[in-house]
A protein has these predicted regions:
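Acidic-glycine-rich active-site phosphate/pyrophosphate-binding loop
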Residues: 133-150
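Short glycine/threonine-rich catalytic loop with a Thr-x-Gly-x-Asp
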Residues: 136-140, 158-169
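Phosphate-binding loop of NTP-binding sites
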Residues: 1-100, 104-115, 146, 168-175
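Beta-strand->loop->alpha-helix junctions that form or flank phosphate-binding loops
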Residues: 22-26, 100, 113-135, 155-161
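Short small-residue beta-strand/loop micro-motif enriched in glycine and branched aliphatics
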Residues: 71, 150-154, 164
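Short acidic/polar mixed-charge low-complexity motifs
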Residues: 41, 123-125, 148-152
Length: 175
């Protein structure tokens, strides 16, 4: 999800004419590579929790899509992994965008004294996908609800229900 979300955010900023810099874990055709040095003020970085590399960053905004069993060989326990995410969140300067449907993520967010905005499908987040429909096998569309108002309709060109979360994160960040 990190690469897709980073790509979606970079694409949205590009299409808005903001010319962002980007470091992405996968190739984004729009920018012809894995990253670019833009002339705008925005920098989009795909951060990874492996060996605490994300703790070297001090983001202005951050997105937490989920906290799952990845890298428990390094952290030793889910508690230690959650603590690393808490430290990452505390280094965020302005706002954290968090998946309201991921219990581990919300366990961490509830402990913070930071500005947090949530997104999700099942739980009532600040940004929520409602009226989710599969318009062809594996591809989804939905209405975007921001706070309590429907503000648009999104039809994803990438397959998988998980990409609804990636798109919600992009919408929240780019708002």
């Amino acid at each position: 999800g990190k690469t897709t979300t980073t790509s979606m955010i970079t694409t949205a900023l590009e299409l808005a004419g903001r010319d962002p810099s980007a470091v992405i874990g996968g190739k984004l055709p729009l920018i012809h590579g894995y990253g670019k040095a833009g002339k705008g003020d925005d920098i989009v970085i795909e951060a990874c929790e492996f060996s605490e590399t994300f703790l070297k960053l001090t983001p202005y905004l951050s997105v937490v899509l989920n906290i799952d069993n990845d890298h428990l060989d390094y952290y030793g326990s889910m508690g230690e992994l959650k603590f690393a995410f808490k430290r990452f969140a505390l280094m965020t300067q302005f706002m954290i965008f968090a998946n309201a449907d991921d219990k581990n993520t919300m366990d961490v967010m509830y402990t913070l004294d930071r500005r947090v905005r949530t997104f999700g499908i099942d739980n009532d987040g600040d940004y929520q996908a409602i009226n989710v429909q599969e318009y062809k096998p594996g591809f989804f569309e939905f209405d975007l609800k921001e706070w309590s108002k429907v503000t648009g309709h999104i039809r994803l060109a990438v397959p998988g229900r998980h990409n609804i979360y990636n798109a919600l994160a992009m919408c929240a960040v780019c708002r």
